[in-house]
Amino acid sequence: MVNVVLALLSGFLFFAGFAPWEIWIAPYVAIVLLFRILCDKALPERFTYSLLAGLAFFLPLLHWSSVYVGSIPWLVLAVGESLLFAAIGLVRWQRRWENALLFSVIFTAIELLRMKFPFGGFGWGRLGFTQVDSLNWLYPWIGVTGISLLVSTSAFLLISKSKTIVVILSIIAATFLLSKILSPDTQGKILQVTAIQGGVDELGLGFNDRAMRVLERHVQATTKIERTDLYVWPENASDVDPLKNEKARLLITDLVRRLESALLVGAVERTLEGPANTSLLFGADGEVESRYVKQDLAPFGEYMPVRRIAESISPYAKQVNDFVPGDKWVRHSINGNPFQSLICFEILDDDHVKDGTKGTTFVVAQTNNATFGRSSEAAQQLQITRARAAESAREFVVVSTTGFTSHLDAEGKVLAKAPQFTAESLTMKVKLVDPRHETPAQQLSTWFWALILGLLSGSAWWRISR
């Protein structure tokens, strides 16, 4: 019974590292506690304790997925993630440093697996998202996956030889000094950007039931700000296709001509193949200068895998239209400065984010959080976005229909944040980075980390078998 309680405590401590708690030290304690519980146990016990820890972690973490659609989708998602998490219990563990090293490696590998599998993956709840306030200077060097490995290595350090601890701490200290010396070139350029959080009439799945209402709210919330170079609207700000609907097009073109500035619009287009989630840059003359189509679609939100099964589980599955994904990155540009839009779910996959942030001077994260009500989803998503800003060493303009609309600096710190659930405009001075600048983390793919994890696990297995 004691181990059952400790397993549940371990899972809750993992959860405590994420919003709304964001206690960065909690995952360190959780990983050590989980390792100690699993040591010297039989397979049934290991798997049971791992599963209990996973449930205590993912059930509260993903509770936002039950808002408006009921408990069944939430339970299916949380249990599915917990089963993948519980794979850590399939290996026999002992209180030896080689086992602890292997534990941290396999734990990180399971996180990468969750990021990619199934249905393209769901990387929510990775330890690498929890350390922005404690290790933000390290993100540009090793990225989210590297941070996950570092946190999970706590179990390794606990029983490691003192010399090993000294070596690892020395490497971390050297990296900290390098991060201060080799900071990215900001070019000395500043771009004034105004993010518009127009809000919705009603939170929930029917936030856009009244045609054009969300668009009208964003038009009304957009007022002319002196010297603003770019206005940005969130995902789904135009709930009707502004390229096909004449009234919607006129509302936007009249607005940008009055503003005398460019406007980035999150819109839902209607194509012959199906709806497309797009980011449209309207120039000051009212013409569309660039168009990016979201590539990494959210399973069960923007398309429905195993539709027949999903519809038998939840009636809301029938309301999901299958969106058409884009097939390439399209850089927007303002005053000759390239930037990229990442749309909502696109911030989750390491490789996708790294490809998207390369060659940019800053990044816009467009999202719509109206469908998750007053849950912690928006705060958790902002935490993830902060990690991405630190990883790419680029400032982020985060714009949401209902919040949190924010300005993040290149270290992932929140410089400004609009309150939730109100119509707000947030004007920020964005420091631009040389688009040629790439952090070391931006050059490390999932395949690289798979190789590193493979080498580390092979080394640990060799030491164990001796």
What kind of feature is each model-predicted range?
Residues 1-181, 223, 374, 385-388, ...:
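Membrane-embedded alpha-helical bundles of multi-pass enzymes
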Residues 182-444:
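Soluble catalytic domains of enzymes that build or remodel membrane lipids, polysaccharides, and related
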